[in-house]
Amino acid sequence: MTDSDGKTDKSGEPAAEVEPVVSKPYVMPDDPEDDALDALNKQLAEAKDRTLRTLAEMENLRKRTAREVSDARTYGISGFARDVLEIADNLQRALDAVPADARAAPDPGLKALIEGVELTERSLHNALEKHGVKKFDPAGEKFDPNVHQAMYEVPDPSIPVGTVAQVIQAGYMIGERVLRPALVGVAKGGAKAAAPE
């Protein structure tokens, strides 16, 4: 026997060279339990996906509902507020109809009536503001068709073109929305209005 080079075998004869055996991975025959496990894993993944989608949908629904409730609180009185604005306009017209000399007259009954109408108008505007309805008077502003309604053009060269020269009726906003646009006269003469920065 020789050393462990593998040149000779136990009988002393030269050993035949042996090629190394490459083993292939063992493939188990199809096991019904593995198929069932794969099916269960697939069902679990689908259930997780459905659960995540349902949770996301519920969160979106919660946010949308909260936004709709907020909008309903803010804008729900729009129809009522429009009707009340007509009353406010009539009170203002009544005050505007009183001549200046009649206001200065010493008649205490007339003064009390004028003060009563003024207090009523102020109280009405305070109630509207309490509910988010705000009056705006755009005199001197650049004309914006989103919040102004042009009724006519004013030929005044001292006012830049496209500027609100006269306000016929004030506008009202509720939250960020226009409840009623301001009725205005827009300047058509003079220098161009500077673009807002």
Swiss-Prot record:
Keyword Chaperone: yes
Pfam family, one: GrpE
Region (Disordered): 1-35
UniProt function note: Participates actively in the response to hyperosmotic and heat shock by preventing the aggregation of stress-denatured proteins, in association with DnaK and GrpE. It is the nucleotide exchange factor for DnaK and may function as a thermosensor. Unfolded proteins bind initially to DnaJ; upon interaction with the DnaJ-bound protein, DnaK hydrolyzes its bound ATP, resulting in the formation of a stable complex. GrpE releases ADP from DnaK; ATP binding to DnaK triggers the release of the substrate protein, thus completing the reaction cycle.
Source species taxonomy: Bacteria, Pseudomonadati, Pseudomonadota, Alphaproteobacteria, Hyphomicrobiales
Source organism superkingdom: Bacteria
Keywords (A to Z) from UniProt: Chaperone, Cytoplasm, Stress response
Record-linked PANTHER family: GRPE PROTEIN, GRPE PROTEIN HOMOLOG, MITOCHONDRIAL
Ranges of compositional bias, category Basic and acidic residues: 1-12
Example GO biological process: protein folding
Oligomeric and partner information: Homodimer.
PROSITE patterns: GRPE
Signal peptide range: none
Name of the protein in its database record: Protein GrpE
Gene name of the record: grpE
UniProt GO cellular component terms: cytoplasm
UniProt GO MF annotations: adenyl-nucleotide exchange factor activity; protein homodimerization activity; protein-folding chaperone binding; unfolded protein binding
Subcellular location: Cytoplasm
NCBIfam families attached to this UniProt entry: PRK14141.1
Similarity comment: family membership: Belongs to the GrpE family.
